[in-house]
């Protein structure tokens, strides 16, 4: 079976936005106009094609990125829907990693919101070119030009409108295409499937000319030949303008900006045209970095059908009918269903049972998958998110994704004995799907703890246990992931010696313990010379310290951000062993930590609260009571925005408190930012409670 769509006509794009900017509705309309859906699914009635998990239908927010294939004007668009809620940024990170381009959707009223800034930063981090779609132009208070300014000021980007609205709110009927200099007006009878191309209305001609001039100037800056033509007063052709927009979009010096109203079926076709005109094909993005596992050298993978297969698993889902689906972005070569593939990250061979192309929640079996495609593999047992799949003879490990550590834990207890076994299996499956979700057993109590990125994240996990796996579970109070660190440098020795008949134990070490920069982790330095401790025992000392650092001396929390230097010691020919040195390392570390001024750290959340002005004083007072540090205060569309760092432990139940303090008019978002030192009076309480 040959490839149906040439590589240069494929677009792998994501739709990224803040909650309620209308992202799912926009994806829906794309599927409707490209002929994949027959009836439009509205988020309001819980029937959107992309939102296919039960809870998403209920909450009206998108949680997992479903990958969908659709076609537009001889091009294949692989659409990845990304969640807009801050607890799910890991999902967004994951999809950014495998996208070639993105459509950022902004609400014409709300503009740039906190989550949009986070998603924008992630897209910058992975170098993803994007276009902006200003949605909801039919809403009261819609203002396209406001959003343009916010993108400049808040996101420090260079938005260049390629179409501007005709009318606004109730009178929004279409757009002016600044490239062709024509008006495009949608008619309501055909649900926006048909539109008329007309002359520009006279009252908008001046504004259109002014914006066209800005567009042409931005395009001319992309190319010397175009610049000369522009400065010489010559007209640029439509083709030249399009080429210039694409160049600027790909090198990220400009962001093409369009508008519409997905809900009212206006502006979606012009958005699709922009996707194929300006966003990159797999062949137009930089080559993907990888490492040759044999030589550890850097290698680059060029997107093409030639060459051995290479792909990245970026998402795992459990499908009720097929079992486990592994979503893979193919970068090079091709693969047939039924063949074997090598997982170079795990060094294991896997057999691919079936290859499925997903159309939101319908699926079609395909025989073969090619470079540039996104496809679900069925039958992989050991492959997890972030693993590389490739050809064994030409192995490569593609750049890994980094997953954040959980900041909040909740104890879960199965209600009955029958739930106990099911719960273990279910939590294992959920942890495979979502790398930012962790499951662990608390040693002292034997309780199962689940960890995640926020309260909503864990709520949804518990909800899925009930719905998908039929496990009834009780949940405990949320617990915060505290950490410990040290503030001063200390040197200590420890001699571990046991001589009680038979073979003894002997390990003797001198270590220096030093604090490191926040967030820099653990470092072990070996400065043993002259063989005072034989080489084979050095890793045992390191291992002893790594085990001991899991339980700090203050309150038994993991110790972070320190450096240990092993600089002296001694050994015994007969009695020394790895075990003895492991114990010596562990004891020396504990003694040194006690003397190194240990302190408790807690997760600090970046909180953004949006409230009407009259509640501002109460909200700030409340954040101060929660030990918050106020960083800035801004205005946005008649509301006050307060930015603060607040300890996570003080934020439980905040949504209820904020709602009652502002009569339901305040909203907030929070995400983990950094670990900060706990004030000593509060640290004392926490330590006593732990030891109590």
Swiss-Prot record:
Any single Gene Ontology cellular-component annotation: cytoplasm
Keyword Ribosomal protein found: no
SUPFAM superfamilies given in the database record: EF-G C-terminal domain-like, P-loop containing nucleoside triphosphate hydrolases, Ribosomal protein S5 domain 2-like, Translation proteins
Subcellular location: Cytoplasm
A UniProt-annotated Pfam family: EFG_IV
Binding-site positions, GTP: 17-24, 81-85, 135-138
GO biological process: ribosome disassembly
InterPro entries: EFG_II, EFG_III, EFG_III/V, EFG_IV, EFG_V, EFG_V-like, EFTu-like_2, G_TR_CS
Keywords assigned by UniProt, alphabetized: Cytoplasm, Elongation factor, GTP-binding, Nucleotide-binding, Protein biosynthesis
Domain tr-type G: 8-283
GO MF term list: GTP binding; GTPase activity; translation elongation factor activity
Family: Belongs to the TRAFAC class translation factor GTPase superfamily. Classic translation factor GTPase family. EF-G/EF-2 subfamily.
Function statement: Catalyzes the GTP-dependent ribosomal translocation step during translation elongation. During this step, the ribosome changes from the pre-translocational (PRE) to the post-translocational (POST) state as the newly formed A-site-bound peptidyl-tRNA and P-site-bound deacylated tRNA move to the P and E sites, respectively. Catalyzes the coordinated movement of the two tRNA molecules, the mRNA and conformational changes in the ribosome.
Protein name: Elongation factor G
Organism classification: Bacteria, Pseudomonadati, Campylobacterota, Epsilonproteobacteria, Campylobacterales
């Amino acid at each position: 079976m040959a490839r149906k769509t040439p590589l240069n006509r494929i677009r792998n794009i994501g739709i990224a936005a803040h909650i309620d900017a209308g992202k799912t509705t926009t994806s829906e309309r794309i599927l409707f106009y490209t002929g994949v859906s027959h009836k439009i699914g509205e988020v309001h009635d819980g029937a959107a094609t992309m939102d296919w998990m039960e809870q998403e239908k209920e909450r009206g927010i998108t949680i997992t990125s479903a990958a969908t294939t659709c076609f537009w004007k001889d091009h294949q668009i692989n659409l990845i829907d990304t969640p807009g809620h801050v607890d799910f940024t890991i999902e967004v990170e994951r999809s950014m990693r495998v996208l070639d381009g993105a459509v950022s959707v902004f609400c014409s009223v709300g503009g740039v919101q906190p989550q949009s800034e986070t998603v924008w930063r992630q897209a910058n981090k992975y170098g993803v070119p994007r276009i902006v779609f200003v949605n909801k132009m039919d809403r009261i208070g819609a203002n396209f030009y406001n959003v343009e300014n916010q993108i400049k000021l808040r996101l420090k980007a260079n938005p260049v409108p390629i179409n501007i609205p005709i009318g606004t709110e109730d009178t929004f009927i279409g757009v002016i295409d600044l490239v062709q200099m024509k008006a495009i007006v949608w008619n309501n009878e055909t649900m926006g499937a048909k539109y008329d191309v007309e002359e520009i209305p006279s009252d908008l001609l001046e504004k259109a000319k002014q914006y066209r001039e800005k567009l042409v100037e931005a395009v001319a800056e992309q190319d010397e030949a175009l610049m000369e033509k522009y400065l010489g007063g010559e007209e640029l052709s439509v083709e030249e303008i399009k080429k210039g927009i694409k160049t600027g979009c790909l090198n990220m010096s400009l962001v093409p900006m369009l508008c519409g109203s997905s809900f009212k079926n206006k502006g979606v076709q012009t958005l699709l045209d922009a996707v194929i005109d300006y966003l990159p094909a797999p062949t137009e993005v930089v080559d993907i970095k990888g490492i040759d596992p044999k030589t550890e050298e850097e290698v680059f993978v060029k997107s093409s059908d030639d060459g051995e297969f290479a792909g990245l698993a970026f998402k795992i889902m459990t499908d009720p009918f097929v079992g486990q689906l592994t979503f893979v972005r193919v970068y090079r070569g091709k693969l047939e269903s039924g063949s074997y593939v090598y997982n170079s990250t795990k060094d294991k061979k896997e057999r691919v049972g079936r290859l499925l192309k997903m159309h939101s929640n319908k699926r079609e079996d395909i025989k073969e998958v090619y470079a540039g495609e996104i496809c679900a593999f069925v039958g992989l047992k050991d492959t997890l998110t972030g693993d590389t799949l490739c050809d064994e003879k030409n192995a490569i490990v593609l750049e890994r994704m980094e997953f954040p550590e959980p900041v909040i834990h909740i104890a879960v207890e199965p209600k009955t004995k029958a739930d106990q076994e099911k719960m273990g299996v279910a939590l294992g499956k959920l942890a495979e799907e979502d790398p930012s979700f962790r499951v662990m057993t608390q040693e002292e109590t034997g309780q199962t703890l689940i960890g995640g990125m926020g309260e909503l994240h864990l709520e949804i996990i518990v909800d899925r246990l009930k719905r998908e796996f039929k496990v009834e579970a009780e949940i405990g109070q949320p617990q915060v992931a505290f950490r410990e660190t040290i503030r001063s440098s200390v040197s200590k020795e420890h001699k571990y010696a046991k001589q009680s008949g038979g073979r003894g134990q002997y390990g003797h070490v001198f270590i220096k313990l030093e604090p490191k920069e926040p967030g820099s982790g653990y470092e072990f330095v070996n400065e043993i010379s002259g063989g005072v401790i034989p080489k084979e025992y050095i890793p045992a000392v390191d291992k002893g310290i790594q085990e001991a650092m899991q339980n700090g001396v203050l309150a038994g929390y993991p110790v972070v951000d320190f450096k240990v230097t092993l600089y002296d010691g001694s050994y015994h020919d007969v009695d020394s062993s790895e075990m003895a040195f492991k114990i010596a390392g562990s004891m020396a570390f504990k003694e040194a930590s006690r003397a190194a001024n240990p302190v408790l750290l807690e997760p600090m959340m970046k909180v953004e609260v949006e409230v009407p002005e009259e509640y501002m004083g109460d909200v700030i007072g409340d954040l101060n009571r929660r030990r918050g540090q106020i960083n800035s205060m801004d205005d946005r569309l008649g509301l006050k925005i307060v930015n603060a760092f607040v300890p996570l432990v003080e934020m439980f139940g905040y949504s209820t408190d904020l709602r009652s303090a502002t009569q339901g008019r305040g909203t907030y978002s929070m995400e983990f930012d950094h670990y900060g030192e706990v004030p000593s009076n509060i640290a004392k309480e926490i330590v006593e409670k732990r030891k109590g």
